[in-house]
Amino acid sequence: MTYPVALYLQDAHDIRHGIELAQYAEAKGFDAVWQADSRLVRDAVVPMAAFAANTDRIKIGSGVLDIWTRNAARLASTFSTLDDLAPGRIICGLGAWWDPLASKVGIDRARPLKVMREVVDATRGLLANETVTVDGYHVHLDVVELDYVYQERRAKDVPIYIGATGMQMMELTGEIADGAVLNYLVSPSYNIGALEALARGAAKVGRTLDDIDRPQLVVCSVDDDRQAALDAARLLVTQYLGQQPHIMKASGVPQELLDQIGEVLTWPATHDQVVAASKLVPDEIVQMITASGTPDEVRAKVDEYVAAGCTCPILYPLADDVHLMIDTFAR
């Protein structure tokens, strides 16, 4: 294994435990730790700051912040501050969020491609120590710059990545972003269309696919007991089958299974519903869209994602022993 690997943390672990996991991953040669921020449970910025303050080398990314609830100027000031804490180690990951969660909190995700372009352009300009004026569809800035008073005025080295799933957003990512955070719970073959879209976008501005970093979230359930590893991943797979059936279908999940899952799950699905629906999900589906099983099986599956164009697997641990997962991919 010659490729870099990263750790993905959501809210399953206490933040202090997350700090310890970030330190352990750093000691084992991991390239980055990414903190989730898609559900209404844990803000990414606070744990990112905690990880930054307690590590020395590892990169720290947001995986990913939505572009609707944070003003572009505040995004820039937030990531400028994180860069002060860990210079050159911070990655700004942005995404267009998802429904029905966004609509339930009053966000109309209209024109996400235009909004993403405006937010990325404005945030990048501010981080580059530019004075920015925009009167756009979503972003409105009137001669705005980061208001440094007590520190050196300098451009901040914070690359911007987009967590894209749809092919139009993927193409935009190839055009405007430093990297694409490829989605999880997809089969490696799903990457073919994603990379084609990235390449189309890159070509618009004279770039190639090689100019775009392509880390990918990979659900990773490792256990010396193979069945225990599969069972640990099954509930998340089931929930995602109900929430994102179009992506699952594109990855090769049979429509009949998606229909059966949809008959059981409401939104938001209750734990009992997910448990009931999980009994419909065979081991083959779990293995198709996750890296689950023994350490050797998991390494082989992650190799498939890299062969399909992922530049750095971002490993999302599901089994109880996160240290075992980190050890499995230690550099």
Describe the role of every protein-language-model region:
Residues Y3-L9, V33-Q35, I60-G63, I90-L94, ...:
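Hydrophobic faces of well-ordered beta-strands that scaffold small-molecule active sites
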